[in-house]
């Protein structure tokens, strides 16, 4: 299981991304708009750079909801391969059965 601090850090990043998403999108739109003067676009870039680093969505990791494990993550189920195997073998995931042929 991942350390509690890592899981909490991830949750903090998720909150920051949600908080600054609209502001970040607006500044990016201004910075990309070629109809605006170069000075305004540059100011938008500077404001974007002053936002917190962790407010960028690229800083987020996918983590298992049950264990916090960042690797071997299944997006559809939001869990790692290890917990997926445990729950599936115990019959706790509806519709998932062990394959045999």
Swiss-Prot record:
Cellular component (GO) terms are: cytoplasm; small ribosomal subunit
User: Is Transmembrane one of the keywords?
Assistant: no
Q: Which gene encodes it?
A: rpsN
GO terms, biological process: translation
GO MF, one annotated term: structural constituent of ribosome
**What's the domain of life for this entry?**
Bacteria
Keywords for this entry?
Answer: Ribonucleoprotein, Ribosomal protein, RNA-binding, rRNA-binding
Organismal lineage: Bacteria, Pseudomonadati, Pseudomonadota, Alphaproteobacteria, Rhodobacterales
The record's family statement is: Belongs to the universal ribosomal protein uS14 family.
For this UniProt entry, which residues form the secretion signal? none
How would you summarize the oligomeric state and partners of this protein? Part of the 30S ribosomal subunit. Contacts proteins S3 and S10.
What organism is recorded for this protein? Jannaschia sp. (strain CCS1)
Q: What does this protein do?
A: Binds 16S rRNA, required for the assembly of 30S particles and may also be responsible for determining the conformation of the 16S rRNA at the A site.
Quote the protein name from its UniProt record.
Small ribosomal subunit protein uS14
Per the UniProt record, one Pfam family is Ribosomal_S14
InterPro entries linked to this entry: Ribosomal_uS14 (IPR001209), Ribosomal_uS14_bac/plastid (IPR023036), Ribosomal_uS14_CS (IPR018271)
